């Protein structure tokens, strides 16, 4: 079950005090979130050249080594800090395949892209049902959504990611999934119905 915002604040403090295992538990709780962002941060031409899990592992390793530089105190600040690290990892990966783009500009562009992807996760929550209460929202909803999506079947997760996070219309989603537009829309409806209780149990 996804930790609450208050649990995360305590875990951040334990990690700062170098309690054994605390930093690993803390960073691992963002793994699904970062994996989803890594996928949306790679365009179609690069998705076959990189495993998002490898990019996330690289980002989490860097975060572990640099945790002393983190100055935030809550879940949202840590999620933002990790997005910045992931953006740099993505920029480094892209640099190996593409040249002529200034690195600093690429990192800023990717950082904005990941921020937009994180915001798009909120729209998935809105589509799946009523918004959570303000007390529940203390936990970063992008992290909650990512953990819930990880529990769905591959097809259910894929249709939500393609439509909401990659912004594809139903015809494009259908082509990617080898189904008709009508079929993927029905699949999406069932996926959202299954997603909502998975979100609720994490809030």
Set out the residue ranges of the language-model regions:
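Amphipathic, Lys/Arg- and hydrophobic-enriched alpha-helical face
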Residues: 27-49, 65-69, 149, 194, ...
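Arg/Lys-rich amphipathic alpha helix in sigma70-family domain 2
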Residues: 69, 84-124, 138, 201
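Structural recognition of an alpha-helix C-terminal capping motif at a helix-to-coil junction
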Residues: 54-61, 76-88
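Conserved RNAP core-binding helix
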Residues: 5-11, 28, 47-69, 166, ...
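Amphipathic alpha-helical segment used for protein-protein interaction
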Residues: 34, 84, 115, 119-161, ...
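N-terminal module of bacterial RNA polymerase sigma factors
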Residues: 1-29, 36, 68, 126-128, ...
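DNA-recognition helix of helix-turn-helix
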Residues: 91, 145, 156, 165, ...
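Sigma70-family region 2
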Residues: 13-17, 40-47, 58-75, 96-98
């Amino acid at each position: 079950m996804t930790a609450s915002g208050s649990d995360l604040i305590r875990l951040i403090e334990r990690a700062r005090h170098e309690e054994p295992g605390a930093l690993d538990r803390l960073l691992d709780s963002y793994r699904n979130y970062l994996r989803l962002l890594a996928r949306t941060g790679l365009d179609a031409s690069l998705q076959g050249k990189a495993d998002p899990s490898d990019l996330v592992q690289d980002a989490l390793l860097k975060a572990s080594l640099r945790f002393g530089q983190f100055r935030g105190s809550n879940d949202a600040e840590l999620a933002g800090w990790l997005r910045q690290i992931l953006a740099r990892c993505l920029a480094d990966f892209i640099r190996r395949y593409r040249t002529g783009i200034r690195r600093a500009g690429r990192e800023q562009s990717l950082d904005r892209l990941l921020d937009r992807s994180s915001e798009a996760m909120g729209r998935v929550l809105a589509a799946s049902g009523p918004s959570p209460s303000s007390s529940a929202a203390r936990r970063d909803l992008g992290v909650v959504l990512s953990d819930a999506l990880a529990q769905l079947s591959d097809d259910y997760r894929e249709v939500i990611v393609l439509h909401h996070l990659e912004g594809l219309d139903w015809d494009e989603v259908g082509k990617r999934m080898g189904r008709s537009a009508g079929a993927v829309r029905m699949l999406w409806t069932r996926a959202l119905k299954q997603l909502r209780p998975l979100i609720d149990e994490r809030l």
